[in-house]
Amino acid sequence: MIRAIEYRRFGGPEVLEEVDRPEQAPDDGEVRIAVRAVGLNPIDFKIFEGDLQPVERVQRLIHPRRWLEGASARFPRGVARDFAGVIDAVGAGVTGLAVGDAVLGTLRSAPGQADTRGALTTALVAPAADVVKKPAPLSFTQAACLGVASQTACGAFRQLNLHEGD
């Protein structure tokens, strides 16, 4: 069993609860990570507080299979996306990553969407493509802060359309 923080309804920190979940084995192309640190971002709070429900409604309109989804299909949900830890299992077909590698990553989902998973857990399974080796000089805590923040910074640089010499 793993320990995780999740929520079953929208609200403030009072809706968060610690639960036991069954440990998952990684499927093809996935790795399981023993989580050492998690990065919390403003988007994480906005999601569990329910601030992004209008975005979720639009997402449901776009995907007809989700039109009849009730609350039970959307909950429970995990908290946080960014993590750092050590790989403890590797699925078939994974190359470049091995058991014992220190890594960092971000649990990816549609923009503004929550996920039933969550990085605020003792272990998680993620696609190997969403995980990179942690640079040795960084602590696990520092590495766990890179995901969403670095994506935001990269997006800003793309918007600025910077070129060499700018």
Each predicted region: which residue ranges?
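Short glycine/threonine/proline-enriched tight-turn/helix- or strand-capping micro-motif at secondary-structure
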Residues: 14-22, 81
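Cytochrome P450 core scaffold surrounding the K-helix E-X-X-R motif
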Residues: 43-48
